[in-house]
């Protein structure tokens, strides 16, 4: 029971949800909570009722810049400890953006930093090495303007112990802080849009315990670079120890597949073996992490998960291969191709734009044709399949 509680003291959706077994005695409550995050492996959910959290009326945000990712992580750990007189966390959000994330959106502070590094104007930073700059988009919320100002003052006092690249400046003006959050929300499609044509944009989702964040974050960045993913980025919910990292991967040769396999094995070693973290923090185990569920949880917990699966789905009909997969190499098989579009000369300009699409679906909320005919993403998916069939001769 203590092991289960410890694993869920941070975000964790690796495997089935075991927390209900230590939180509830009522079988109905256990079953209902088991369904959350089961990814269709136990049952089909036709309807869900969600409760929303309180929306604080007063908010302020600041984009904090640090010269190293380790210093940024230390600041996050310190801010995590801030609480007000009622016991509420002072900082409600801290989103980390590494140098590649900032570069992908042409962040003006990053461009300034890059210029100073290039001209050797920053003491202690190697000329031309802009890889250290890291931003932490920090948010605080309150019920009154006075409470908001108290929160800002507490955070500013906390940050005096750390070296920032530019002075700390909070803003409570929506027209200003909305620009910060637009940068954050645009990272995934922006990084994906810079990938080499024909490669696949992959995003993973891990979590560390907050006390391990400074060392673990720096080691994660070094690990990804060591495998040659020079266009990769790390960003995400640092306040929860939860990061996403994006890599642009080719699967066109066996050597590239092997490079990806080696990366995932080293990620497993870093996250699980060294820091006892979560290989999947919030977006589901799927097939890519299915081979590592037992490694993260251990034999006893994995057997308990399989016993639950057999109770609900003894014939293995529901979402086969997801979460539970007997093939230890299922994550390096059956890759979804993203072929370059084959179009007429007149439509070549269109194909160059469409080839950048990573099929994230973020465009569909603004798509004028979605729901009437095909959405823009569906059109690109179909065009890619047509191109694949033409290229393969099928």
Region annotations inferred by a language model:
Residues 1-19:
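Long, charge-dense accessory insertions within large macromolecular proteins
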Residues 12, 20-28, 32-262, 270-278, ...:
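C-terminal substrate-recognition/cap domain of FAD-linked oxidoreductases
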Residues 38, 212, 234-241, 256-259, ...:
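Secondary-structure capping and boundary motifs in well-ordered enzyme cores
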Residues 41, 75, 266, 304-307, ...:
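Generic recognition of well-ordered alpha-helical segments
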Residues 190, 194, 291, 295-349:
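Activity-critical C-terminal alpha-helical subdomain
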Residues 245, 283, 313:
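Hydrophobic, well-ordered secondary-structure elements that form the walls
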Residues 275-281, 314-318:
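Alpha-helix capping/hinge segments and adjacent helical runs
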Residues 329-355, 364, 370-394:
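Ferredoxin-type iron-sulfur electron-transfer modules in oxidoreductases and energy-metabolism complexes
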């Amino acid at each position: 029971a203590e092991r289960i509680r410890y694993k869920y003291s941070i975000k964790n959706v690796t495997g089935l949800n075991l927390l209900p077994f230590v939180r509830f005695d009522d079988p109905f409550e256990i079953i209902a909570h088991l369904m959350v995050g089961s990814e269709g492996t136990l049952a089909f959910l036709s309807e869900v009722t969600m409760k929303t959290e309180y929306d604080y009326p007063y908010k302020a945000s600041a984009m904090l810049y640090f010269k190293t990712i380790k210093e940024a992580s230390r600041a996050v750990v310190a801010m995590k400890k801030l609480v007000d007189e009622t016991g509420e966390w002072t900082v409600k959000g801290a989103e980390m953006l590494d140098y590649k994330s900032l570069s992908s959106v042409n962040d003006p502070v990053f461009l300034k930093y890059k210029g100073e590094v290039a001209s050797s104007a920053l003491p202690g930073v190697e000329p031309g090495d802009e890889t250290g700059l890291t931003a932490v988009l920090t948010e605080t919320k309150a019920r009154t303007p006075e409470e908001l100002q108290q929160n800002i003052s507490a955070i500013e006092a906390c940050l005096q112990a750390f070296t920032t690249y530019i002075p700390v400046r909070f803003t409570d003006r929506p027209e200003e802080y909305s620009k910060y959050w637009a940068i954050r929300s645009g990272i995934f499609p922006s990084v994906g849009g810079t990938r080499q044509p024909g490669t696949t944009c992959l995003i993973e989702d891990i979590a560390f315990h907050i006390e391990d964040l400074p060392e673990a974050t720096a080691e994660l960045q070094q690990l990804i670079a060591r495998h040659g993913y020079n266009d990769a980025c790390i960003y995400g919910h640092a306040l929860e120890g939860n990061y996403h990292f994006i890599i642009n991967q080719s699967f066109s040769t066996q050597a590239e597949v092997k490079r990806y396999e080696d990366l995932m094995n080293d990620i497993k070693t870093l996250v699980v073996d060294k820091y006892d973290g979560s290989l999947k923090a919030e977006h589901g185990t799927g097939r890519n992490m299915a081979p590592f569920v037992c490694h993260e949880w251990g034999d006893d917990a994995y057997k308990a998960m399989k016993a639950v699966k057999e109770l609900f789905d003894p014939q293995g009909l529901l979402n086969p291969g997801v979460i539970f997969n007997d093939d230890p190499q299922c994550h390096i098989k059956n890759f979804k191709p993203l072929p370059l579009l084959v179009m007429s000369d007149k439509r070549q300009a269109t194909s160059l734009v469409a080839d950048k699409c990573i099929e994230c679906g973020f465009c569909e909320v603004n798509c004028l044709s979605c729901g009437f005919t095909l959405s823009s993403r569906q059109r690109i998916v179909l065009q890619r399949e047509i191109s694949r069939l033409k290229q393969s001769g099928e």
